[in-house]
Amino acid sequence: MSDNFAAVGIALVVAIAINLIMMLMPKLLAPKKPVPEKLTPYEGGNQTIGRTWLGFKSNYFLYALVFTAFDVETVFLFPWALSFRQLGTFAFIEMFVFIVILLVGFWYAWKEGALEWM
């Protein structure tokens, strides 16, 4: 059993070492003198006037959050549905409560406008 852990540990150390090497190589091999052309903005080469960082409202995370909740529900529902006959009434009640909690959360998100676009 400890041989399996040793193999996982060695693989982890090798993966970390490869990542560190790949992150350090550009810093070691890149030219050190900054060229003025590389410091100019790309878009047309024009110097910007005023504030250049414009914030925008992104609601994708709300959709991702709701999707993740229902994706987790699917992960729990699939094995439960496959072994439904062996589990009995108690498992049915537990899964029913789980689905009700998720539906209440979905209803609340809908009511609060979390699913409205912009």
Curated annotation (Swiss-Prot):
NDH-1 is composed of 14 different subunits. Subunits NuoA, H, J, K, L, M, N constitute the membrane sector of the complex. It is found in: Cell membrane. It catalyses: a quinone + NADH + 5 H(+)(in) = a quinol + NAD(+) + 4 H(+)(out). The chain crosses the membrane at residues 5-25, 61-81, 90-110. PANTHER family: NADH-UBIQUINONE OXIDOREDUCTASE CHAIN 3. GO terms for cellular component: NADH dehydrogenase complex; plasma membrane. This is NADH-quinone oxidoreductase subunit A. It comes from the Bacteria. It comes from Desulfitobacterium hafniense (strain Y51). Keywords: Cell membrane, Membrane, NAD, Quinone, Translocase, Transmembrane, Transmembrane helix, Transport. It holds the Pfam family Oxidored_q4. It is an enzyme of class 7 (translocase). Belongs to the complex I subunit 3 family. The keyword Transmembrane applies. InterPro entries: NAD(P)H_OxRDtase_bac/plastid (IPR023043), NADH_UbQ/plastoQ_OxRdtase_su3 (IPR000440), NDAH_ubi_oxred_su3_sf (IPR038430). NDH-1 shuttles electrons from NADH, via FMN and iron-sulfur (Fe-S) centers, to quinones in the respiratory chain. The immediate electron acceptor for the enzyme in this species is believed to be a menaquinone. Couples the redox reaction to proton translocation (for every two electrons transferred, four hydrogen ions are translocated across the cytoplasmic membrane), and thus conserves the redox energy in a proton gradient. GO terms for molecular function: NADH dehydrogenase (ubiquinone) activity; NADH:ubiquinone reductase (non-electrogenic) activity; quinone binding. It is a multi-pass membrane protein. The keyword Repeat does not apply. Its EC number is 7.1.1.-. Gene3D superfamilies: NADH:ubiquinone/plastoquinone oxidoreductase, chain 3 (1.20.58.1610).
